[in-house]
Amino acid sequence: MTVDKTKKTIVIGHKNPDTDSICSAICYANLKQITSGGEYVPGRAGHVNSETQFVLDYFGMAAPKETQTVKTQVKDIEIRETKGVAKNISLKKAWNLMQDAGVVTIPAVTEDNVLEGLITVGDITRSYMNVYDSSILSKACTQYTNIIETLEGAMLIGDEREYFKEGKVLIAAANPDMMEYYIEKHDLVILGNRYESQLCAIEMEAGCIIVCEGAGVSMTIKKLAQERGCTVITTPYDTYTAARLINQSMPISFFMKTENLITFDTDDYIDDIKEVMASKRHRDFPILDKNGKYKGMISRRNLLGPEARM
């Protein structure tokens, strides 16, 4: 049988231990340590009496650490170390991370590894269905960095660290005369290489224009955009593809679950959390260490065969 050398096994005698029980645990743990190469430590299930303490002192041995219970704890089972992410990453990036890791839930954490929320595959797919709200990109306070990354584009004018936080998203499919009636201040306009359309969008005080199909932008347009405070981004995608992809640039913080999160501690007992897990529709549950920091994830599957502690 292959021994998992990363797991610690506690060797314990009977309750209310006498000298035989304590000494047997010490000897057997030492024997297993030598013969198997695994980590075996002696334990005791009760107080050390005076006779046993005399024997231990005589041979210069420390008393085994008392084990209050041998019930399996969360730290005794396999915890999936799903890496936490920043809450401002895009939906597209979160989706790609899930696919690469083969998971359906990703935790959002702070730089200090404090859990802030959970985003699931279901949350991401539901976000794609919200196609009728043309202002959702600004409501989500989407950073231009995310937009550039999602559209595989480049920023010509503006600061990619800034946020699109006011206005709607629209496609400039009509001629400039018609555009004047539906472009409003702060809007994000997706358009092509037509000089007149770019000029009209900037003059109508659009907050950002996205020029598609890798089209060049004239110096006149760049200068005017700079003067009017209009961000200019280029993308190799056509207008249809850019319009479909842009909602994937929204931060996961707008869709992730942040309230009433069900978490468990590494010291929680499996018997205590089974009922909670069974009563919830969640597939994955975050695990926190004794300092309240994010440790990893477990699911019902992890509870099928937890290893005994002794």
Regions found by a protein language model. Give the residues of each.
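Short, small/polar residue-rich loop motifs at catalytic or cofactor-binding pockets
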Residues: 101-103, 279-282
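Short, glycine/polar-rich helix-capping loops at beta-to-alpha or helix-loop-helix junctions
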Residues: 51-52, 216-223
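Short hydrophobic alpha-helical runs that function as membrane-insertion/retention elements
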Residues: 41, 65-66, 106-107, 188-191, ...
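Short, ordered loop/turn segments at secondary-structure junctions
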Residues: 15, 45-47, 111, 121, ...
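Short beta->alpha transition motifs characteristic of CBS
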Residues: 103, 114-130, 237, 286, ...
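Long, charge-dense
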Residues: 133-134, 222-257
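Bateman/CBS regulatory modules and CBS-like beta-alpha motifs in cytosolic regions of diverse proteins
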Residues: 10, 67-97, 109, 144-157, ...
